[in-house]
From Swiss-Prot:
The keyword Ribosomal protein applies. Residues 254-263 have a biased composition (Low complexity). InterPro entries: Ribosomal_uS2 (IPR001865), Ribosomal_uS2_bac/mit/plastid (IPR005706), Ribosomal_uS2_CS (IPR018130), Ribosomal_uS2_flav_dom_sf (IPR023591). It comes from Nitrosococcus oceani (strain ATCC 19707 / BCRC 17464 / JCM 30415 / NCIMB 11848 / C-107). GO terms for molecular function: structural constituent of ribosome. SUPFAM superfamilies: Ribosomal protein S2. The keyword Ribonucleoprotein applies. Residues 242-253 have a biased composition (Acidic residues). PANTHER family: 30S RIBOSOMAL PROTEIN S2 PROKARYOTIC AND ORGANELLAR (PTHR12534), SMALL RIBOSOMAL SUBUNIT PROTEIN US2M (PTHR12534:SF0). GO terms for biological process: translation. This is Small ribosomal subunit protein uS2. One of its GO terms (cellular component) is cytosolic small ribosomal subunit.
Amino acid sequence: MANVTMRQMLEAGVHFGHQARYWNPKMAPYIFGKRNNIHIINLEETLPLYMEATNYLGRLAANKGTVLFVGTKRAAQEPVREEAGRCGMPYVNSRWLGGMLTNFQTVRRSIKRLHDLEAMIQDGSLDRLKKREALTVRRDRDKLENNLGGIKNMTHLPDALFVIDVEHERIAVDEAAKLGIPVVAVVDTNSDPRKADYIIPGNDDAIRAIRLYLRGIADGIIDGRTTAAAASASKASKDEFVEMEEASEEETLTESLSEKSASTDASVT
């Protein structure tokens, strides 16, 4: 489980919302007050919701679920790539292509094209093309890598989305809603919390805050997988012990019956 404290949230600026005039009234339960016309988010509300979201994604990962990280705004791009990569999850950090979820079959064809182009580059096939043709292939590969590189190993729709800024990523959030895919999201004071199934009320602009969310979520996913793997190994070991014990008992019984049979034969003789 992610070990994040309220002090760490304060230091990262999680409590700073948007200007009061841009607020969404639906966020009122999570707002502590105003300072210099900036809404201050109540971290006593944020911390438990953050832990709930982290635990949910950890349980999902423990059951071999896939979490798609989404953060295409400039401050989120690098942290999303780093933390999604660290916990082995797919991500979108450049641009959300319309239909990335709702038209996933078409996206998969583009992903296959990306893999084919990468194979051409790696096996030397590109060297047999004319210079202009080779340049076109590389440009196509680079474009596909930029748009789809984070999901090129995602073979099926994700089981959940983790989103930085529901307002900025509204297309992704809407697509997930249409498909019934749960959304875990950082929701600032200018956004509608009803768009996410698990909300984390907090600053969605500051890079330190974004890194804190992502690091904790990634840790939760890694912990979930580790715990599940340990439980699976323990069960396998226990099953093996039971099988050995049963085999030993069966062998003992067989020997006992053999001895009894031999004793009976001797008595008859």
